[in-house]
């Protein structure tokens, strides 16, 4: 279920404050955050935000296509190594 339109999009206040300060100064720094549930706003375009994935911070460069999505969508928490190939050890030999 999506968030109520009445409430508006969620973004952590401290993250938005840091973005606005950097925009005023005209700087582009990597901003560390643990707030995966924050919605990406248009003010964030062009910044790199390091989103925590559970063990490290993954740098995410914000582009126009990402506006409206959550930060956590771009920092995967699980590593997919592909399906296991069948080998002699994994297959049962019927006798």
From Swiss-Prot:
Keyword line: Ribonucleoprotein, Ribosomal protein, RNA-binding, rRNA-binding
Keyword rRNA-binding attached: yes
GO molecular function, one term: structural constituent of ribosome
GO biological process: ribosomal small subunit assembly; translation
Protein name: Small ribosomal subunit protein uS19
Organism of derivation: Clostridium kluyveri (strain ATCC 8527 / DSM 555 / NBRC 12016 / NCIMB 10680 / K1)
Function per UniProt: Protein S19 forms a complex with S13 that binds strongly to the 16S ribosomal RNA.
One GO cellular component, as annotated: cytoplasm
PROSITE patterns for the chain: RIBOSOMAL_S19
HAMAP family per record: Ribosomal_uS19 (MF_00531)
Recorded family membership: Belongs to the universal ribosomal protein uS19 family.
Span of the signal peptide: none
């Amino acid at each position: 279920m999506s968030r109520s339109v009445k409430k508006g999009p969620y973004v952590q206040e401290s993250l938005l404050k840091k973005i606005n300060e950097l925009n005023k100064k005209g700087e582009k720094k990597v901003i560390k955050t643990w707030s995966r549930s924050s919605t990406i706003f248009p003010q964030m375009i062009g910044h790199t935000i390091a989103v925590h994935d559970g063990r490290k911070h993954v740098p995410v460069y914000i582009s126009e296509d990402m506006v409206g999505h959550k930060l956590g969508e771009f920092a995967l928490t699980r590593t997919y190594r592909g399906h296991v190939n069948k080998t002699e050890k994994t297959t049962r030999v019927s006798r």
